[in-house]
Curated annotation (Swiss-Prot):
The gene is CYP71BT1. It comes from Catharanthus roseus. It is an enzyme of class 1 (oxidoreductase). Residues 1-24 form the signal peptide. This is Cytochrome P450 71BT1. It holds the Pfam family p450. Glycans are attached at N111, N168. The keyword Oxidoreductase applies. One of its GO terms (molecular function) is iron ion binding. PANTHER family: CYTOCHROME P450 71D11-LIKE, CYTOCHROME P450 FAMILY 71 PROTEIN. Keywords: Glycoprotein, Heme, Iron, Metal-binding, Monooxygenase, Oxidoreductase, Signal. It comes from the Eukaryota. Belongs to the cytochrome P450 family. SUPFAM superfamilies: Cytochrome P450 (SSF48264). Heme binds at C447.
């Protein structure tokens, strides 16, 4: 009898709280949106297609700001530059928070001590400043130039050695961006580099899968049912062990240098060639940061670097090459520019990049049509606010459809066409001030890795277009027939790999 009374009391209390919450929301002017079903919300409406495509279609029905429910999670979707500006500039502080109950980020961020998902506050400000000023600043990115050049030339030589044969260019591109990132992070080629890549590939495969438990934060038992968190923890343990070994090796090397009393000139030379782990360990040991930098903080930032500099960069490079090859006039103009400017060198290097106009426009146009993340990483409203005349309750998540805004005919002529010339002599840039074009996001949470990513796209693209003319296999038709189908993953890579036949250009240094 007592148990029955407790049960009835709990049920009445639950109903009372539900009624109170319902009355509170009914008093608000909420954004429009599709009617959610009990329990599942609108989950049934997002299956069977690419999320950013589905959300664009919904925006055509419900407007540039609409509300949708993923299970228990209320989310607003933004598809307009004007509203994105309200989110990222007017109310930037309110929307600078990240949701803290997504399985993949719970596990793989060292208790949210990375930059992408750290809670907005002193720690996040410190780590972002370190990232922008110390790790991925202009001078540091330039210092990685020799790594880029060497790794890209390795790729070019490999492709050249397979002239006339079918090459899986996509596979080589993904290997290239990983190698550049790994050497920038760890220094010389590490004996753990390949096994680390294998683990990161497995992690990426897991991270791309939706965990239904993320949509029901109050139902903790679902974590056990889906098993996603358990799998992630196993993977995380393996990745963590490799990263700790790499940090310990760096620490041992530093101690050896101290004991050997390296002279000042030698120190200066080495400091110019520091890798990212070195930079973070310098800050760790200096004691000059407001908050201590732990080994776990270093590992979290390294995983961030791989997230920004690995697959997303490779996907952009892959799209840029595919779009250039598919569009005959774009290919002709790009190759003419490159082969004129670098004719005497018979090779491309970054010292001549300031003379290029069309190649940077190709990169910008690729980012418009194929942004690295078609939907912005989720943010969370820290307090109730008003956006576009609608009330947004606290804890509401927000996603910005960056992909849709880059294809909006209101802001772009012939938005579905690949036209790099639209960016020549244009002041529109990807640095977060032009809200119709924010491939790296905007506001306080803008991606700090853009300065690292852009050269890692531009140099290999330039080399691949300079050194080779390209053909497809006879069964695949012509270059103009290349498909542009997206893979349904977060970074929107190509669904089908680029498999091409290289023909070495007569003016290339590869031609003996």
């Amino acid at each position: 009898m007592e148990n029955l009374f407790i049960f009835l009391f709990a049920l009445l209390l639950f109903c009372f709280m539900l009624l109170k919450l319902s009355k509170k929301y009914s008093a608000l002017k909420l954004p429009p949106g599709p009617r959610p079903l009990p329990i599942i919300g609108n989950l049934h409406q997002i299956g069977g297609g690419l999320m950013h495509h589905i959300l664009r279609e919904m925006a055509r029905t419900y407007g540039p700001l609409f509300r949708i429910k993923f299970g228990q999670v209320s989310t607003i979707v933004v598809s307009s530059p004007e509203i994105a500006k309200e989110i990222f500039r007017t109310h930037d502080v309110v929307f600078s928070y990240r949701p803290q109950n997504i399985a993949v980020f719970n596990v793989m961020t060292y208790n949210f001590s990375n930059i992408a998902f750290a809670p907005y506050g002193n720690y996040w400000r410190q780590m972002r400043k370190i990232c922008v000023m110390e790790i991925l600043g202009a001078s540091r990115v330039r210092s990685f130039g020799s790594i880029r050049q060497e790794e890209v030339m390795n790729l070019i030589r490999f492709v050249g050695s397979h002239k006339g044969k079918l090459v899986n260019v996509s596979e080589k591109i993904y290997g290239l961006t990983y190698s550049i990132t790994a050497r920038a992070a760890f220094g010389k080629v590490s004996k753990y580099q390949q096994v680390f890549k294998e683990h990161m590939d497995k992690y990426d495969d897991l991270a791309r899968g939706l965990d239904i438990a993320d949509f029901y934060p109050s139902m903790k038992f679902l974590r056990l049912v889906t098993g996603m968190e358990r799998k992630l923890k196993v993977m995380f343990k393996e990745v963590d062990e490799i990263l700790q070994v790499i940090i310990d090796e760096h620490r041992d090397q530093r101690m050896k240098k101290i004991r050997s009393k390296v002279d000042d000139n030698e120190k200066e030379e080495e400091e110019g060639n520091e890798d990212i782990v070195d930079v973070l360990m310098n800050l760790q040991q200096s004691g000059q940061t407001e908050l201590p930098v732990t080994d776990d903080n270093i590992k979290a930032v390294i995983l961030d670097i791989f997230g920004a500099g690995g697959d997303t960069t490779a996907a952009t490079l892959e799209w840029a090459l595919a779009e250039s090859l598919k569009n005959k006039q774009v290919l002709k103009r790009a190759q003419e520019e490159l082969r004129t400017i670098f004719h005497s060198k018979r090779n491309v290097d970054e010292s001549g990049f300031n003379q290029l106009k069309y190649l940077p426009a190709i990169v910008k146009e690729t980012l418009r049509l194929h942004p690295p993340a078609p939907l912005s990483l989720p943010r969370e409203c820290s307090e109730e606010c008003n956006i576009y005349g609608y009330d947004i309750p606290a804890k509401t998540r927000v996603m910005v459809n960056i992909w849709a805004m880059g294809r909006d005919p209101k802001y772009w002529s012939e938005p579905e066409e690949f036209k790099p010339e639209r960016f020549i002599d244009s002041r529109i840039d990807y640095k977060g001030n032009d809200f119709e074009y924010i491939p790296f996001g905007a506001g306080r949470r803008i991606c700090p890795g853009m300065s690292f990513a852009i050269p890692n796209v531009a140099l290999p693209l330039a080399q691949l277009l300079f050194h080779f003319d390209w053909k497809v296999d006879d069964d695949a038709g012509k270059l103009e027939d290349l498909d542009m189908v997206e893979h349904p993953v977060l970074e929107a890579r190509r669904k089908n790999e680029l498999k091409l036949i290289p023909v070495i250009y007569e003016g290339s240094c590869l031609k003996n």
